[in-house]
C-alpha cells in the first residue's frame, strides 16, 4: 500500500490560494453575467438544453422537470432547485422585460407566491430566446467539454439582441456584485445603429437614445436626467422609481386612489402589508383603508380619510413611508470579452456587444463560405461525372478499387470521388447538367457576397446593422412587448412636512395619563374625573384638555421629548394603551405632558439643580424614538418642563431652602445640561414653579392654598442656596403636598 505524500506548506498561503480559487469560481461561473450575451453559466446551459430538446416557440411544451433533468444531468451538476428557480424567473413577465421562456402553469406571482412544482409546469422557448442562439450551429461560437467530458456546451451565445441591457442582470459574488436594470430594446437598437454609423460617438450621444431603464412592471423614474446620465457614465448609481396612480372619482364628491403600477422587484403583498402596518400604527392619518383588487393587472385601491384630502399630498406621504417609491441600484459590473470582470459604462457595454456581433458575423460568413467552397468542389466533380457517366458507372461496377482509378483518369479530388461514390447509381443517371450549372452559378454569387463581407469591413457592418434593424422591427415600440412601460417625471424632493392636522376635524378632548403610563382621550372638556377608571394599583397623573388637531409633547425623566398627534391617542372609556406602544420611552417616567404651541418658551430643570429655557419649536420630534433635549447626569432626572407664563421662578430642594429669582437670568438654549438654578450640597432639586412677582408665590398644602405676597426674603441671584420657606410650606418640599 502506497504511503500518502504529505507536503508541508504555510497555512496562510494555502488558505489564500483556495479562497482565491473559490472567489474566481464564484465570479466567473456563477454570479456575474458575460457582457456579450448577458447570461450566467446556468442560464446558458438551461437555454442550450432547451434548444437540444427542440422546444421551439412553435413546438409543444415539455415538462419543466424534463428540462431541469437534462440541465443537471448533462451540463450543470448542481441542485435541481437552483436550476428550476432560474427557469421560473426567465418565464416571469414581471421579472424579465423580455421573457426568454414561455411557461405554462403556475410560475409564481408578483405577490411573491412560489411557482408550482416542476412536475406540474411546462415550458418552451420564446421568439426572443431563439435570437440568443441563432446560428449557433454555424461555428459562430466556441464549445467546450461539459463537466464530465461526455458532451459539449457553448462558451458563449451568438446573441442577436443585446440581452444584458434589455433584460438586465443581478448577482452577488465574492467581493463584487452586479445590478443592471432592464432597458427598452427599440432604444438600445437605435443606440447600436448610431454607434455603427458613428464609431467615435460618446456617452452623451448614446444617452440621447437610451433615456433610462424600462422596467417590466412600469412605474415612473423621478430622478433628473443628470442623475441618470451620471449613472450611465460611471456604471454606478441609483434611480428612484415611483408607482403609477390615478384619482378615481366616486359619488357624492368622494374619490379613491388607484395604483396601477408598482416599482420593479417590489412584492405587492408585502407592500400592502407595509401600508396596513402603518395604518394600524396611525402613521398615515390621511389614509383610511387599502384593498387589493388586482387580477392579471395591478389595482391597489387607497381610500383617503376625508374627501377634502389632496390626493397628491396623500400619495407624497405614502411615497416617503412605503415601497410605493423604491430606489433601484445600478452597478454595471460584468465579465468582459477578455474574461476579466470590471465595471463598464453604457457605451463600453454596447461596444462590446457590437464587437461580439462582428465576430459572430465573421465566423458565420467563414463557415458558410467554406460550406459553399466544399459544395462547389463537389459540383465540379458531379459535372465531370455527368460528362463521363458511362465510364464512371462501368468503373464503379467492375473495379474493386474505383476510387484511385477515378482520381487518376478524371483528375478528381478525393472529396469529389467520395461524393460520386456516395451517390446512388440511379441518382447518377438522373443528373442533369443544367441543374448542376445553375446551382454552381448561384453558389458562386453567394461566395462573392461572403468574400466581400469578409474582405470589406463596411459590408460586414452593414450586415450587423441589418440584423439589428430586423430585431428592432420585430420587437420595436409599435409591438405589444416592445412599447415603453416606464416613463420619466422629474420630482424635486423637499423637506416640507405635510400638515396632516388640516385634514382632521377639530374636536375638544381630554387626555388622561396614569401614573403607570396608560394614556387615553375622552371627548369634550370639563370631564367628570370621578367616573374615570384605572387599572388596579394605578391612578391619575396628568389631565390635559386639548383638541384633536393639537400636537402633544411628552417629556421623559431622561430629558427626551416625544411628539404625538392628539387624534392618534386611544379613544374611549377603557384604560387606554401604554405610552410605550406610542413612543420609545423605555423604562423612564413621564415628567410632563403638554400641548405644543409654536414659539412658546419652556423651562427645563433637572434634579442636579440645573436648567435652561428652550423654544417649543426645537423640541418637536419627528420619529418614535424622540429627541434628546436635556442632558441629565447619571443618578439624576429631569424633574420639570413648564411653559414660561410668569416673570419669576421659585426653586426648592431636599435642603428645604427656597430661592426666588428673575426668569430672565436663565439663558435660552437648544439642548444641553443648562446652568445652575440653585446651589446644593449633597442634595437634589425637587420642584420649581413659575409665577408673576406681583401676584405672589402660592402653594398647596393638604388642599389648602396659601399665597405669599412678601417674597423679598427669598429673593436672590440664580445659583444661590436660598432660605428656609415660610411657615405652612408643605413638608415634602414641593409646591403641592399631593
UniProtKB/Swiss-Prot annotation:
Subunit details: Heterotetramer composed of ParC and ParE.
Family listed: Belongs to the type II topoisomerase GyrA/ParC subunit family. ParC type 1 subfamily.
Protein name, as recorded: DNA topoisomerase 4 subunit A
GO biological process: chromosome segregation; DNA topological change
Record membrane topology: Peripheral membrane protein
Site (Transition state stabilizer) residue list: 119
Organism: Rickettsia conorii (strain ATCC VR-613 / Malish 7)
InterPro entries the UniProt entry points to: GyrA/parC_rep, Gyrase/topoIV_suA_C, Topo_IIA-like_dom_sf, Topo_IIA_A/C_ab, Topo_IIA_A_a_sf, Topo_IIA_dom_A, TopoIV_A_Gneg, Type_II_DNA_Topoisomerases
